[in-house]
Amino acid sequence: MQKTLKKNFTLSGITLHSGEISNIKVNPAPANTGILFKRTDLKVPHIETLLNAKIENVVFSELCTKLSNEYGHSVSTIEHVMSAFHGLGIDNAIVEIDKAELPILDGSSLEYVSEIERAGIKNLQAKRKIVNITRPIIFRDNDSYIKVTPANNMSINYTIVYDHKLINEQNFIFDLDSTYNYRNIISNSRTFGFKDEVEYLRDKGLIAGGSLENAIVLDNDGIMNQSVLRHDDEFVRHKVLDFIGDIYLLGHRVKGSFEIFKGGHRLTHELVKSIMSDKSNWNYDYDKSDLDDLTFSTLDHKKELSASL
């Protein structure tokens, strides 16, 4: 069955790139809404404030995932909340936001997970569609690549390589088969960066809100944070966290076996585009836990969505 929240929740915090305080309100949504972002700060017609979290709305942005609608309005750094939605099985939600960027919080998805669980999750009377990969697909960029092959569930095999003694080469294998696994194995892994890149990125107008409170920062000696790593392989686990958020831009959960080598946001976006570009790459399946053939009528769905917005 499709799922949403039982009630709304709010969060506030500094944004990673613009350095502003951003306030969000995450609301339940009716079946077949998907994940929808709504800019509450814009003084424009209502329809122009909405951004659907699907690959066709993704635009290029360094170091994060950014959506833009046909009216030129955007919202960025959505990957962590998208990861939490995917990891906890939330199919439908409306995220109201009063800035163009989501708060970075502690650099992981843990706070989103905690708030979703506190709000509660409820079933909706509609079957959950799943994107089922039907043939191998690969996207390469120099020595980086990402590929997917057909499978009965969603599995991730992720490898990162960095010239730093705390990272070197890290590999992590993860099956997105339970909310417990996502919460306890992935959700608290923080974003990371390198001290010698900070000045360069800030000169480009990025990471204005970055600090040791919301990212792991590495110098030549190790990590600069007073806190210790949450996992020895926290770096690659965070990459898995980002991937779980970005692959959800398919608009549905997915069945496929993913192998990623030296990946990132853009590589995942390109794979999603490749998947959706040819209907022979995939078909729709249904969650096997859905025993009843229950759907909202189009009219009921439109009425509920209108009321939610």
Residue ranges of each PLM-predicted region?
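C-terminal regulatory domains involved in ligand/effector binding and gene-expression control
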Residues: 1-91, 96-309
